[in-house]
Amino acid sequence: MNLYLQLDLYLYNDNLYLYLYLESGVVPIPSPLEQFEIIPFLPMKIGDLYFSFTNPSLFMLLTLSLVLLLVHFVTKKGGGKSVPNAWQSLVELIYDFVPNLVNEQIGGLSGNVKQQFFPCIFVTFTFLLFCNLQGMIPYSFTVTSHFLITLGLSFSIFIGITIVGFQRNGLHFLSFLLPAGVPLPLAPFLVLLELISYCFRALSLGIRLFANMMAGHSLVKILSGFAWTMLCMNDLLYFIGDLGPLFIVLALTGPELGVAISQAHVSTISICIYLNDATNLHQTCLLFIYN
């Protein structure tokens, strides 16, 4: 039987390495955060600015290319079939789902005006969905597990929603900062709180997606590494004990796949809700700001 002798932790090139020393040899324990490492393929630097082409850039391009090719082959002239195949059914399912989501979550507008938001919502949903799903493929990279990527996406959408709010309502868009019925002495404090709350929408949109994807992938990686370490111990008792973590990893794959789909759905719903708030000002203020 392999006996535990020593567990060492090394820091090399800003990476942590765990080594388990047994009588039969050394078993490396992979770090669960190693899968999120950014690797520059084409380093580019201008002054203090870095424009390197990295693995997140590669997988984002692959995801975007896959989405565009899939939609192109289905929607091009003669591309659709009377009896749809699996890929055509997938595109049609998403194409039917997004307009229903827009109609349900964005109110107070005509159907034609609502459909102006359809391209943005459709591209955002499909991009997030395919980014999350391709992260489930072994040895791939989960783009949405990096905070700066999700934060950049959420802030871009947040700025666009704010511009839409000003385009439709002018300066009266600022009336959401002061709900009706608020005592005048409390108005400055409430305006500040509402402004902070509004700005935190962009943070919450990015943090929610990043945290869920990173936590789920880290958990699967930890259990997978534990199962692999037990398999490397060359002992029947450890092999039998490895079946538990192995079955847990297989069982977690299904919920993690559900999380990948649901997070794209939740993020899209949040964007639609923010668009609804920007286009339909349900809150009125005591002092109206006219155009």
UniProtKB/Swiss-Prot annotation:
How is this protein annotated for GO cellular component?
Answer: mitochondrial inner membrane; proton-transporting ATP synthase complex
Name the keywords, alphabetized. Answer: ATP synthesis, CF(0), Hydrogen ion transport, Ion transport, Membrane, Mitochondrion, Mitochondrion inner membrane, Transmembrane, Transmembrane helix, Transport
Could you tell me where this protein is found in the cell?
A: Mitochondrion inner membrane
Q: Which PROSITE patterns match?
A: ATPASE_A
User: What Gene3D superfamilies does the annotation carry?
Assistant: ATP synthase, F0 complex, subunit A
CDD domains assigned: ATP-synt_Fo_a_6
Q: Which family does it belong to?
A: Belongs to the ATPase A chain family.
Its biological purpose: Mitochondrial membrane ATP synthase (F(1)F(0) ATP synthase or Complex V) produces ATP from ADP in the presence of a proton gradient across the membrane which is generated by electron transport complexes of the respiratory chain. F-type ATPases consist of two structural domains, F(1) - containing the extramembraneous catalytic core and F(0) - containing the membrane proton channel, linked together by a central stalk and a peripheral stalk. During catalysis, ATP synthesis in the catalytic domain of F(1) is coupled via a rotary mechanism of the central stalk subunits to proton translocation.
Subunit text = F-type ATPases have 2 components, CF(1) - the catalytic core - and CF(0) - the membrane proton channel. CF(1) has five subunits: alpha(3), beta(3), gamma(1), delta(1), epsilon(1). CF(0) has three main subunits: a, b and c.
The protein's name is ATP synthase subunit a
Query: What is the protein's species of origin?
Result: Vicia faba
